[in-house]
Amino acid sequence: IVTVDCSDYPKPVCTLDYMPLCGSDNTTYSNKCNFCNAVVDSNGTITLSHFGKC
């Protein structure tokens, strides 16, 4: 199982770094920060599907 540590999120501003992650909602997030903010917003219902684009 692939996991990402989102314990230090949410962050108010994310960098523009592009290291895509695919969420369980079938959305490609541009980087860990954007993904983790979405995880927090979803109360943990979104999980990491895999690294890279969906």
UniProtKB/Swiss-Prot annotation:
Entry's localization field: Secreted
Keywords noted in UniProt: Disulfide bond, Glycoprotein, Protease inhibitor, Repeat, Secreted, Serine protease inhibitor
CC terms in the record's Gene Ontology section: extracellular region
Cysteine pairs bridged by disulfides in the record: C6-C36, C14-C33, C22-C54
Carbohydrate attachment residues: N43
Site (Reactive bond 3): L16, D17
Record SUPFAM superfamilies: Kazal-type serine protease inhibitors (SSF100895)
Domain of life: Eukaryota
Family matches, as Pfam families: Kazal_1 (PF00050)
InterPro entries named among the record's database cross-references: Bifunctional_prot_inhibitor, Kazal_dom, Kazal_dom_sf, Prot_inh_Kazal-m
Molecular function, one GO term: serine-type endopeptidase inhibitor activity
PANTHER family in alphabetical order: OVOMUCOID-LIKE-RELATED (PTHR47729:SF1), SERINE PEPTIDASE INHIBITOR, KAZAL TYPE 2, TANDEM DUPLICATE 1-RELATED (PTHR47729)
Domain topic, free-text comment: Avian ovomucoid consists of three homologous, tandem Kazal family inhibitory domains.
Name the record gives this protein: Ovomucoid
